Amino acid sequence: MNEKILIVDDEQSIADLVEVYLQNEGFQVRKFYNAAEALACVEKEELSLAILDVMLPDMDGFTLCRKIRENHLFPIIMLTARVEDIDKITGLTLGADDYITKPFNPLELTARVKTQLRRYIQYNTAAQPGSACQNPADEISIRGLFISKSSHKCFLNEAELTVTPIEFNILWYLCEHRGSVISSEELFSAVWGEAYLDSNNTVMTHIARLREKMKEPPRKPKFIKTVWGVGYTIE
């Protein structure tokens, strides 16, 4: 395996434990106990995924996540000891792809790393020129919104939208099922491939981030509409 995983956690015992489990799976690991050194690594090396703790000595993990997202699209998993929803929502809104609360099972974290990497690799493979023949079924156009599954690119009024693999898959699924109301449960299962939990706000926060990138009016979105108590739809 050539994938490089960044670990940033000021709790050395946790960082060391995660490092051991990931190395046992064949991953290369770059481990740091503060944000400054981690950011320097991000700019120097080609990374495949980052695992960021929320509480760091020199910068909170959410700020670190936002700084990484300014120039990089690789998956980010947040670690937090606080279970308040605001932590999870803030992390995902700033660009994280997943989160896991402490204490956690290292095997679960490893499984999530593999899941995120698989999606990211598929995303990059599909985005390579010539990786797939153009097929009308792989392209959807709705009122100035153009989305291509073969190139994994989105355009709104001819301006390209910078979206993560998760955001792309959410938008594609909603466009593909245009006119239908898709529940959070169905959307989560289709995009993440996991069982949905009632307390899970992941779908909501990714929808909010997509709307923000599409410059949608919060109260009257043009594209992704909420059907309260039911789900989301693109008409």
Model regions: which residues?
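His-Asp phosphorelay/catalytic-motif detector in bacterial-type signaling
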Residues: 2, 46-48, 71-76, 197
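Short, Lys/Arg-enriched segments at the junction into DNA-binding effector domains
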Residues: 4, 115-168, 172-179, 185
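Charged docking surfaces used in two-component/phosphorelay signaling
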Residues: 16-24
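Short hydrophobic/Thr-rich beta-strand motif most characteristic of the beta2 strand and flanking loop
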Residues: 26-34, 41
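Acidic catalytic/metal-coordinating carboxylates
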Residues: 33-34, 60-63, 87
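Active-site beta3 strand of CheY-like receiver
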Residues: 46-51, 56
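Basic, amphipathic DNA-recognition helix from helix-turn-helix-like DNA-binding domains
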Residues: 66, 70, 75-141
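Positively charged, aromatic-enriched patches within helix-turn-helix-type DNA-binding elements
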Residues: 153-222, 227-230
